């Protein structure tokens, strides 16, 4: 079959002096960073949905892209053509992983039977493509939010029959992910929330969602899936308020239903923006709570209140994110999935490469800067100094539960405590970070 991207062989690393827009300037897969290949640190993935399913439509205009697999025709044949182009893209971009929703790769059909049969055929196609290309599946998931049946949610729907349909999709998508060797399975509650409390029973919906997640965990163990289950937090859109608002909210939910040891988090940069947090904050929070799993690498627009899903281009922002990830030991089953799309006006097919190349270079440079921060150790040293009092006898007795509130009050009076505030030196630390960012 003729190549779709016929003007490009493969994207290659050419170094920072290159002016070739279809070459990497910073991402060198084989470069060693802290003793590990860059490719192994970053674990890049391209997503199926924004890259090959979006047709350029928005709320104010119809599809703007001319994609051959989005033209009228037999649904399965078009899905197979889309898979051909997708794996050509993955290969030429040098990404080791990809991600999908069930209906990204397979026609939904008019019934559950058609859905299952179509998906089974496409899983065989994807398995062959993976074998041929060496590209692996980072994670799969089920789209339980686009079809009108999910207007009031999937797991939180007032109709148990909709709940059951969603369960069928998750079973099918998880088993497909397992068969394809996927390293994670993602759960994003696209419409698990509410528009108005006037028709919503919050307790009922929370119980439904909790039971659904428990069943997902049960099924994972039943089929022997060894990958990681991930929830992707998002505060709103498409609903007014979603139950998986941010990392801290999801932690509370998981604790309530006894799932905190079973499910981790897939953190998206743009969702952090919508929640009023920095990307850095959400990553650090997930790590602090022991829930860090994977990342959807993109960016939002602080001046817009919706998910713009742009490609990451801020080395400054992502250097601190990669610093947190490296400090925590790096990715295990997770990676950096580009949940990002070209702009509606970017209608040239090679714009897909420009977006991903820039994003991969951004994250590669961020990784190298983060590694310098780790090797230097100055930030860690400053934080250790700031909290050093907690290593004292008093600090340890407090943390180990050896002193009560009354004991502390007595101690403070007996020792005539008069603590003096110590500077946080924020400005100095910001200058230090800029040194890593901008000084060679």
Curated annotation (Swiss-Prot):
One of its GO terms (cellular component) is cytoplasm. The active site is at residues 101, 104. It catalyses: alpha-D-xylose = alpha-D-xylulofuranose. GO terms for molecular function: magnesium ion binding; xylose isomerase activity. Keywords: Carbohydrate metabolism, Cytoplasm, Isomerase, Magnesium, Metal-binding, Xylose metabolism. It is found in: Cytoplasm. Binds 2 magnesium ions per subunit. It is an enzyme of class 5 (isomerase). Its cofactor is Mg(2+). It comes from the Bacteria. Mg(2+) 1 binds at residues 232, 268, 296, 339. The keyword Transcription regulation does not apply. GO terms for biological process: D-xylose metabolic process. Mg(2+) 2 binds at residues 268, 271, 307, 309. InterPro entries: Xyl_isomerase-like_sf, Xylose_isom_bac, Xylose_isomerase. Its EC number is 5.3.1.5. The keyword Isomerase applies. Belongs to the xylose isomerase family. HAMAP family: Xylose_isom_A (MF_00455). NCBIfam families: PRK05474.1, xylose_isom_A. Homotetramer. This is Xylose isomerase. The lineage of its organism: Bacteria, Pseudomonadati, Pseudomonadota, Gammaproteobacteria, Enterobacterales.
């Amino acid at each position: 079959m003729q190549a779709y991207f016929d003007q490009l062989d493969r994207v290659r690393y050419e170094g920072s002096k290159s002016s070739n827009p279809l070459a990497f300037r910073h991402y060198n897969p084989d470069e060693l960073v802290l003793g590990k290949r860059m490719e192994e640190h970053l674990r890049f993935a391209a997503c199926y949905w924004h890259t090959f399913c979006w047709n350029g439509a928005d709320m104010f205009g119809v599809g703007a892209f001319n994609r051959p697999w989005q033209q009228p025709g037999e649904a399965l044949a078009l899905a197979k053509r889309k898979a051909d182009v997708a794996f050509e893209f993955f290969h030429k971009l040098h990404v080791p992983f990809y991600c999908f929703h069930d209906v990204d790769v397979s026609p939904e059909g008019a019934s559950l039977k058609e859905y299952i049969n179509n998906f089974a055929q496409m899983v065989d196609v994807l398995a062959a493509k993976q074998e041929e290309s060496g590209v692996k599946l980072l994670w799969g998931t089920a789209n339980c939010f686009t079809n009108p049946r999910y207007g009031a949610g999937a797991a939180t729907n007032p109709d148990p029959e909709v709940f059951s349909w969603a369960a069928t999709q998750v079973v099918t998508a998880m088993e497909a992910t397992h068969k394809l060797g996927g390293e994670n399975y993602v759960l994003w509650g696209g419409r698990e929330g509410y528009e108005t409390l006037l028709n919503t029973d919050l307790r009922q919906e929370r119980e439904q969602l909790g039971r659904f997640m428990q069943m997902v965990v049960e099924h994972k163990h039943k089929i022997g899936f060894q990958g990681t289950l991930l929830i992707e937090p998002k505060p709103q859109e498409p609903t007014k308020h979603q139950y998986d608002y941010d990392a801290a909210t999801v932690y509370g939910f998981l604790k309530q239903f006894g799932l905190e040891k079973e499910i981790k988090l897939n953190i998206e940069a743009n969702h952090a923006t919508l929640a009023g947090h920095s990307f850095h904050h959400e990553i650090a929070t997930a790590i602090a709570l022991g829930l860090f799993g994977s990342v959807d690498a993109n960016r939002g627009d602080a001046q817009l209140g919706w998910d713009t899903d742009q490609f990451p281009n801020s080395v400054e922002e992502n250097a601190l994110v990669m610093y947190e990830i490296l400090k925590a030991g790096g990715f295990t089953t997770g990676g950096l999935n580009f949940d990002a799309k070209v702009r509606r006006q970017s209608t040239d097919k090679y714009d897909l490469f420009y977006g991903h190349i820039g994003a991969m270079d951004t994250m590669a440079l961020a990784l190298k800067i983060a590694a310098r921060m780790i090797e230097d150790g100055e930030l860690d040293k400053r934080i250790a100094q700031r909290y050093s009092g907690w290593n004292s006898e008093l600090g340890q007795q407090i943390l180990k539960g050896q002193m009560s509130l009354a004991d502390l009050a007595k101690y403070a009076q007996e020792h005539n405590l008069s603590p003096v505030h110590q500077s946080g030196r924020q400005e100095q630390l910001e200058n230090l970070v800029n040194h890593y960012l901008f000084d060679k």
